[in-house]
Amino acid sequence: MTNIRKSHPLLKIINDSLIDLPAPSSISSWWNFGSLLGICLGIQILTGLFLAMHYTSDTATAFQSVTHICRDVNYGWILRYLHANGASMFFICLFLHVGRGLYYGSYIFMETWNVGILLLFAVMATAFMGYVLPWGQMSFWGATVITNLLSAIPYIGTNLVEWIWGGFSVDKATLTRFFAFHFLLPFIIAALVMVHLLFLHETGSNNPTGIPSDMDMIPFHPYYTIKDMLGALAMILVLLTLVLFSPDLLGDPDNYIPANPLNTPPHIKPEWYFLFAYAILRSIPNKLGGVLALVLSILILIFMPLLHTSKQRSMTFRPLSQCLFWLLVADLLTLTWIGGQPVEHPFIIIGQLASILYFSLILILMPFISIVENYLLKW
């Protein structure tokens, strides 16, 4: 008699993707972040659902409703801080997941990679809209500045911005629609995750060597279920440490001041996970140019399969490419730091140089070094 998990129509799907899934025997802890992202999404949807039960998306009461959640709702404070810091954990895992993909050449699976980029954009949009909801100073001015960037689009820009705002400024209509979309998008993200996994399971996982591992596969359960549980435990430990000891570490103090359209904060900046893109935006003096650079800083990932000139898939055996990869990581950390600094000397020039280096590394230096490595290996 066949085991029910292999014959039942629903259990069969779960079995084929979580239990009997053939996985390469050599995948390292860098392959843990997919499951961690799934856990992050689950935490965000659950905490968000309970927060939405007490939140009101009205400009007059939004700030008060968040205060009410923290002060009066049973365990409301932990829900709020789990949700806020859960977003930070989500992005840490996302950046590490994408970084792993770049290092080990996972972008060769083009369908999986492209759905992943779509997921990245969806998560960024969700996080941005979520940051507006508490209706503090940084929420209001962040929403004003970022949505205003669309006015740089020729001809339709101004109309587009007013259409998104639902009026002539960020107001009640904007807050209400942002709440609606912030609630809806995570479920769309969950559906996209299914598509992402569907494409991944068509090809099977990559591995650190970049060499096909079809002849050396092991079942996902128990080997990788236990490994993922260890990763999940570590991530939850970090998240709870952050929530229980320093919940406002990654937030902005200005967001504890209720939104005031008549008073602009001295330094408008987004959450830390957008600072690298914000620095690239600010480093170009032209508005349209800045917006294009901002979009391209993420969209450039789409071109990775086309920019892959090496005869090897992974960077494991390519020391020159490894140097450039870690230079790119250092450059992104520099951009993140610059994004949080005021627009003055020497931060302006550092930001401009870091932005030039970012695009040069991805578009010119890394493909060129790969060709050099091919030549050195006489390929």
Curated annotation (Swiss-Prot):
Binding-site list for a ubiquinone: 201
Segments traversing the membrane: 33-53, 77-98, 113-133, 178-198, 226-246, 288-308, 320-340, 347-367
Cofactor: how bound: Binds 2 heme b groups non-covalently.
Cellular component per GO, a single term: respiratory chain complex III
Bilayer topology term: Multi-pass membrane protein
GO molecular function, one term: metal ion binding
Binding residues for heme b b566: 97, 196
Keyword annotations from UniProtKB, A to Z: Electron transport, Heme, Iron, Membrane, Metal-binding, Mitochondrion, Mitochondrion inner membrane, Respiratory chain, Transmembrane, Transmembrane helix, Transport, Ubiquinone
Entries under SUPFAM superfamilies matching the protein: a domain/subunit of cytochrome bc1 complex (Ubiquinol-cytochrome c reductase) (SSF81648), Transmembrane di-heme cytochromes (SSF81342)
Cell compartment(s), UniProt: Mitochondrion inner membrane
Residues where heme b b562 binds: 83, 182
Cofactor entry: heme b
CDD domains for the chain: cytochrome_b_C, Cytochrome_b_N
GO biological process: mitochondrial electron transport, ubiquinol to cytochrome c
A Pfam family this chain is assigned to: Cytochrome_B
Quaternary context: The cytochrome bc1 complex contains 11 subunits: 3 respiratory subunits (MT-CYB, CYC1 and UQCRFS1), 2 core proteins (UQCRC1 and UQCRC2) and 6 low-molecular weight proteins (UQCRH/QCR6, UQCRB/QCR7, UQCRQ/QCR8, UQCR10/QCR9, UQCR11/QCR10 and a cleavage product of UQCRFS1). This cytochrome bc1 complex then forms a dimer.
Additional record remark: Heme 1 (or BL or b562) is low-potential and absorbs at about 562 nm, and heme 2 (or BH or b566) is high-potential and absorbs at about 566 nm.
Summary of the function given for this chain in its UniProt record: Component of the ubiquinol-cytochrome c reductase complex (complex III or cytochrome b-c1 complex) that is part of the mitochondrial respiratory chain. The b-c1 complex mediates electron transfer from ubiquinol to cytochrome c. Contributes to the generation of a proton gradient across the mitochondrial membrane that is then used for ATP synthesis.
Database matches in PANTHER family: CYTOCHROME B
Family label: Belongs to the cytochrome b family.
Name of the protein in its database record: Cytochrome b
Organism of this sequence: Epomops franqueti
Originating gene: MT-CYB
